[in-house]
């Protein structure tokens, strides 16, 4: 609901669809934002067509667990990596994806997932947040990244620098993107004692306004937004919406006072 509630004025007329695994949270969001369509189900069960959305925004779950989805099982993705892969498939070519994830996505030793993403999307920019960013909202102290990607129109086999890790001038090993763009790290690197011994983390700058730092970092990210190209031979407007899992296949339903027919 936070993403919907903070939508800029220029996007107020957008058609918004959400997926929320917690039924209570989904119900609250649906009541607060009644013009949206919120599916109360796990993301892996969401029946959403490919190349459907202009933008995908979310806060992906973290954890060392895997999701059972036959389409993606061969990749052996951890849950946060799975969210990136499926979200990219649901995004139209040229569409923008902005996801909050743990620093593990960018900093893990294996480059496999980053290469998978790079083949399908261009990294427009990444912002590393200090470890207290979500402490007040979620009660967690974890270094998080905002990754902003633009989907490619075709698969490309390449490995940009951000697929790999590098070491900064202080000997801290991290994603090469943040070594090359230290201004996108909104805090100071410190070595602290963690659950598994010493670990590198990002602590907030003293007396710094995270909102101002974030706005400045975002101003460094640029993209050319392309309009979706509609086939001129199509004679009817595509008014399809993601299928409601509670509506039986090949049956009619009413959404926002309009009649729809569910087909797959």
Regions of interest found by a model, annotated:
Residues 45-48, 132-136:
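A short acidic, often aromatic-flanked loop/helix-cap motif at beta-alpha or helix-coil junctions
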Residues 136-235:
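Flexible, glycine-/basic-rich loop-and-beta segments that form/coincide
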Residues 1-58, 63-65, 77, 94, ...:
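Conserved S-adenosyl-L-methionine
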Residues 61, 131, 152:
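Flexible loop residues that form catalytic
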Residues 222-264:
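Charged, often flexible domain-edge or linker segments that flank or initiate folded functional domains
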Residues 19-23, 28, 76-135, 142-149:
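Conserved Class I SAM-dependent methyltransferase catalytic core
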Residues 64-65, 106, 156:
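Short glycine-rich, flexible loops that bind phosphorylated cofactors or substrates
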Residues 70-75:
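Short glycine-enriched, charge-decorated loop/helix-capping segments at active-site entrances
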């Amino acid at each position: 609901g936070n993403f919907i509630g903070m939508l800029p004025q220029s996007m107020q007329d957008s058609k918004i669809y959400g997926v929320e695994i917690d039924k209570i949270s989904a119900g609250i969001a649906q009541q607060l934002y009644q013009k949206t369509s919120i599916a109360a189900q796990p993301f892996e069960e969401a029946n959403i067509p490919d190349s459907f959305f202009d933008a995908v925004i979310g806060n992906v779950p973290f954890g060392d667990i895997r999701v059972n989805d036959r389409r993606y099982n061969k990749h052996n993705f951890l849950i946060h990596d799975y969210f990136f892969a499926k979200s990219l498939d649901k995004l139209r070519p040229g569409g923008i994806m902005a996801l909050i994830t743990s620093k593990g996505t960018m900093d893990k030793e294996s480059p496999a997932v980053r290469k998978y993403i790079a083949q399908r999307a261009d990294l427009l920019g990444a912002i590393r947040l200090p470890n207290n960013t979500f402490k007040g909202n979620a009660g967690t102290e974890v270094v998080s990244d905002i990754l902003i990607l633009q989907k490619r129109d075709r698969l490309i086999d390449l490995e940009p620098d951000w697929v790999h890790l590098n070491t900064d001038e202080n000997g801290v090993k991290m994603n090469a993107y943040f070594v090359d763009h230290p201004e996108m790290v909104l805090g100071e690197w410190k070595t602290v004692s963690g659950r598994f011994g010493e670990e590198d983390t990002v602590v907030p700058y003293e007396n710094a306004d995270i909102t101002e730092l974030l706005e400045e970092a975002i101003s460094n990210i640029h993209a050319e937004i392309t309009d979706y190209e509609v086939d001129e031979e199509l004679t009817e407007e595509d008014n399809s919406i993601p299928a409601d899992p509670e509506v039986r296949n090949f049956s009619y339903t009413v959404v926002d006072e309009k009649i729809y027919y569910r087909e797959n």
